[in-house]
């Protein structure tokens, strides 16, 4: 399959041979040989370009791309737990988005994750925002409780919200409220009298998100 020519190894290929075989000094290069060289160079450039495009597409197909369009919230629910950028050791602080209340068009809660994930879908531009799941579920429960809707529907919705947290062995305490910003857990994880101390501000119950991120790595 290979031949030796002027100390160089070249493969029997109608295109590669023309590009790799020995060329005489520049003073002996004819216009025909120059045109042949340019054609070979163009072919090689095309091969490299196609290989780069294919490689780029394959890499993008194996990771979660955080550039979102209006019809792509479903991709968030299909993604594995911990795929959101907020889950990678960052604390749950207030989202840095102006007018968040009026710009939020949807709320998603991934209850099967441990800890659960809550994502706000924000418009203009459309994108997901990972937020404190316990605070979100607590806020939704309060809205449903005070909302003007049929009682049977209200009870079913409250049960679904409570179940979204009970899947991860936790449920919010209605009196003590949601955990502080930057924390996953809250007073509802502890039994009295510790819960009373936390409610009165005598004890801190904050466990940062980085704690759960480290658990996922181990």
From Swiss-Prot:
Disulfide bonds: 81-113, 183-206
Keyword Transmembrane applies: no
Keyword Glycoprotein included in the entry's annotation: yes
Single GO cellular component term: virion membrane
Listed GO biological process terms: fusion of virus membrane with host plasma membrane; symbiont entry into host cell
Keywords of this entry: Disulfide bond, Fusion of virus membrane with host cell membrane, Fusion of virus membrane with host membrane, Glycoprotein, Host cell membrane, Host Golgi apparatus, Host membrane, Membrane, Viral envelope protein, Viral penetration into host cytoplasm, Virion, Virus entry into host cell
Stretch list, region Interaction with gH: 57-185
Family note: Belongs to the herpesviridae glycoprotein L (gL) family. Alphaherpesvirinae gL subfamily.
Protein name (Swiss-Prot/TrEMBL): Envelope glycoprotein L
Organism this protein belongs to: Equine herpesvirus 1 (strain Ab4p) (EHV-1)
């Amino acid at each position: 399959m290979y031949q030796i020519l002027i100390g160089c190894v070249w493969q029997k290929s109608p295109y590669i041979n023309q590009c790799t075989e020995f060329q005489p000094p520049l003073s002996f290069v004819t216009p025909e040989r120059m045109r042949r060289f340019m054609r070979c160079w163009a072919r090689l450039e095309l091969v490299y370009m196609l290989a780069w495009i294919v490689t780029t597409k394959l890499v993008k197909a194996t990771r979660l791309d955080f550039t979102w369009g209006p019809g792509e919230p479903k991709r968030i629910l299909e993604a594995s737990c911990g795929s959101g950028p907020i889950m990678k050791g960052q604390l749950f602080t207030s989202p840095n988005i102006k007018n968040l209340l009026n710009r939020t068009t949807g709320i998603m809660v991934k209850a099967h994750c441990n800890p659960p994930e809550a994502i706000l879908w924000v418009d203009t531009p459309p994108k997901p925002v990972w937020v404190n799941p316990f605070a979100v579920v607590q806020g939704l429960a309060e809205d449903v409780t005070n909302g003007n809707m049929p009682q049977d529907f209200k009870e079913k919705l409250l049960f679904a919200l409570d179940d979204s947290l009970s899947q991860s062995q936790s449920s919010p305490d209605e009196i003590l409220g949601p955990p502080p910003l930057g924390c996953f857990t809250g007073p509802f994880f502890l039994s009295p009298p510790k819960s009373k101390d936390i409610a009165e501000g005598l004890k801190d119950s904050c466990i940062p998100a980085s704690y759960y991120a480290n658990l996922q790595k181990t």
